[in-house]
């Protein structure tokens, strides 16, 4: 975005990246929305100009929940990329039942749910870097899973209540997060949302072939609104 004269500031969700906490664990989804709210407010205080929240995957779902919770009062618009609203591969019913039980009994119990880099990007170098990144853990706790599922249901059910414009980005060939979830989101908020599905792209539209088009779409949308 720097090439378009726009600055970016990044936050690692707790339990991920360089942020503290057990890998892939939160006590409650609201911890992520509180973190997102605090981060955006901090950046707003630093830059003194409009800050447009952008969330990718889990971050996309988090931004949506944060907006719906009224925790981004100064935000006039926002962007979500491949928002984690619907997984591509259906989870068996017995796993859902087990996850719900474990969330109550052993909330910190976690399983590996690795995603290979080839599922994220068609650029071999990007995939290789991802596969060897020590900050990538692929862990998901039972509590995070149930909190996430509840959050996605709430987002889709209440998306029509979003009053500010937002842009939804998705890859047509995303094999991790089903792009139909983005379509459902847009269908629930047709007056405030704009959906762009990029043909042939995978889960990481910013790190895939033709990423320049994605950045251009964002820049044009920000300048237009």
Where are these regions (language model features)?
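Alpha/beta-hydrolase-fold enzymes
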Residues: 54-141
